[in-house]
Amino acid sequence: TARFVNENNASCLFLSATMPNFIKKMLEDEIMPIEFVAPSPSDQSDREILEKKRHNLKICDGDVLTNIADIVAAIKNSNSTLIVCNHVPSAQLVFEEIRKKGVTDAKLLHSRFCRRDRDAIEKTLQERLPKVLVATQVVEVSLDVDFEQGFSEPAPIDAIIQRFGRVNRKGERSPAKVVVFTEQISKYNIYNKDIVSRSITELQSLSNPLREIDLIDVANRVYKCGYSGEDLERYNNALNHPLIKCYKERLIAGFHYDWTEQIIEKTDGTIELLPRCLATKYAEYQAQGLWLESNRLLVPIRAASLSYLSEYLNKNDDPWIIKSYFLAR
């Protein structure tokens, strides 16, 4: 898209809370020289932003479950707490443990809710924060929420920064407690292990309270060599995808084709399934020609997960139907 608008003398604006230097170079290499606007330490108003202190960080050994007693105690002493896990099953386990320990004002948010239900949950969060929200990476994007404290599984620094951004969001309170654990619950890694390790090491070198500029500097140090390994391969595969390379040949005026979503999904390897409890409603929407409404009942699942979900799947239908209790666990 950026290439296309640039070739047609239009403007394109990139906005990001985390823009490591290597990303800037990649954008310039692929498009054209770009004017980057960032807060300047020499400007007083910008300096106030860069020096803003919103968080007190603690790096804690172990994972969320091994520290669940301390987390529950902290939850009971706070009005609102955010816990972010890297995997849906991990978030479900943590949610169940917290409920078992007497915290009833709790919400769960992850990518295995169908779009309809996820939108409903997000709407309730905008109206009132629960005592605790257990979420996955979905909380990093779009949600304008402000928790009093946060706990997170280990992740790359850019993801950590986004998670911190949901705690003491406006910086109007004294620095809030944020805890990052050194281990995750799941044995499966969705992030580059070296990047996660470097992120934790760099965070450990910081002094409290954290300044915004501290986190920007950490992101640049962690990504000083750019992408590598699987991350670089994934980037190149998406960049060289035929839908991007040959977009001019496929361009039809007035026709909308969600090629970006298709590329991302194929790169990430996801497939949309229909929960069995929603099959009747899906059929009703389809019969009425309500295609958008029916699609909002589908749930994205990583293709890599299908190998151990076979007993829950009915592949005779289109879309495939999955037993609902698996998703609700």
Predicted regions and their residues:
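Conserved helicase ATPase motor motifs in RecA-like P-loop NTPase domains
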Residues: T1-L27
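Short glycine-/polar-rich loops that comprise or flank the Walker A/P-loop
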Residues: N8-A10, E51-H55, V103-D105, V145-E148, ...
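Loop/turn-to-beta-strand initiation segments
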Residues: N8-F14, S80, L129-V132
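Interdomain hinge/linker at the junction between the two RecA-like core domains of SF2 helicases
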Residues: M19-K76
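Conserved RecA-like helicase motor-core motifs
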Residues: P33-S42, K101-D117
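Conserved strand-helix element at the start of the C-terminal RecA-like helicase core
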Residues: A74-R99, L108
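Conserved RecA-like helicase motor core of SF1/SF2 enzymes
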Residues: S111-D119, L129-K187
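C-terminal accessory region of SF2 helicases/translocases
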Residues: F147, I161-F164, K170-R329
